[in-house]
UniProtKB/Swiss-Prot annotation:
Protein name (record): V-type proton ATPase subunit D
Functional summary from the UniProt entry: Subunit of the peripheral V1 complex of vacuolar ATPase. V-ATPase is responsible for acidifying a variety of intracellular compartments in eukaryotic cells, thus providing most of the energy required for transport processes in the vacuolar system.
Organism: Arabidopsis thaliana
Disulfide bond entries: none
Mode of membrane association: Peripheral membrane protein
GO cellular component term of the entry, any: plant-type vacuole
Keyword terms, alphabetized: Hydrogen ion transport, Ion transport, Membrane, Phosphoprotein, Transport, Vacuole
Length: 261
């Protein structure tokens, strides 16, 4: 399990936050698809296992039957029948070809048997044991068919087993490493952006307070300047000092406040 502090080394920006969210969405979708693929491969894996068990049981019976048939041929036609059969065979009539089958994106090798050409040993053992020779041939053909099927199943089984292990490793990596790391990175970026937002808000409040105080100071200076100008006008008009003009102005303001409307 990835640690709580495991994250990607990124610059905490809004753009990077969008990139990390997109990567998390992609990782989540990939995890879901790989999980479905693993489940599908597991189902196929179990089905192959059942077929292999059945094929092995059938192979045992077939090999037993073919061995008994060969023993019967040797008893009836003699040990020489093997050389007679080999002399009449120039090329194999039962052959095997390979192909691939795609299951959930995994290519599984398959083997198929087929007959090609004519059998040249139909008259083998005509003097004695001909019926037993044909029965032995049929028994061994069936045994070969079962062996080919078993080889195909076991090869597909091993390939599928490796594919399931690889898929499960990817699922675990996405679930326990990639997704937690992306989630931690997103949480880190959000925390840093929130901190930057708080700092910007505090800085803005300080600037607003400074501007407000500056406006108040300028207003006070303007008011003081206006009062000075009024006092100078009164002083010049009445020929009195600035202090006398200030007292005159204050006294006039007090008389105005006593007037009752």
């Amino acid at each position: 399990m990835a640690g709580q502090n495991a994250r990607l080394n990124v610059v905490p920006t809004v753009t990077m936050l969008g990139v990390m969210k997109a990567r998390l969405v992609g990782a989540t979708r990939g995890h879901a698809l790989l999980k479905k693929k693993s489940d599908a491969l597991t189902v196929q894996f179990r089905a192959l296992l059942k077929k292999i068990v059945t094929a092995k049981e059938s192979m045992g019976d077939m090999m037993k039957t073919s061995s008994f048939a060969l023993t019967e041929v040797k008893y009836v036609a003699g040990d020489n029948v093997k050389h007679v059969v080999l002399e009449n065979v120039k090329e194999a009539t039962l052959k095997v070809r390979s192909r691939t089958e795609n299951i959930a994106g995994v290519k599984l090798p398959k083997f198929d048997h087929f007959s090609e050409g004519e059998t040249k040993n139909d008259l083998t053992g005509l003097a004695r044991g001909g019926q037993q020779v044909r029965a032995c041939r049929v028994a061994y053909v069936k045994a070969i068919e079962v062996l080919v099927e078993l080889a195909s199943l076991q090869t597909s089984f091993l390939t599928l087993d490796e594919a399931i292990k690889t898929t499960n490793r990817r699922v675990n990596a996405l679930e326990n490493v990639v997704k937690p790391k992306l989630e931690n990175t997103i949480s880190y970026i959000k925390g840093e952006l929130d901190e930057l937002e708080r700092e910007d808000f505090f800085r803005l409040k300080k600037i607003q307070g400074y501007k407000r105080r500056e406006v108040e100071r300028q207003a006070a200076n303007a008011k003081e300047f206006a009062e000075e100008m009024v006092l100078e006008d009164i002083s010049m008009q009445r020929g009195i000092s600035i202090n006398a003009a200030r007292n005159f102005l204050v006294g006039g303001a007090e008389k105005d406040s006593d007037i009752i409307f």
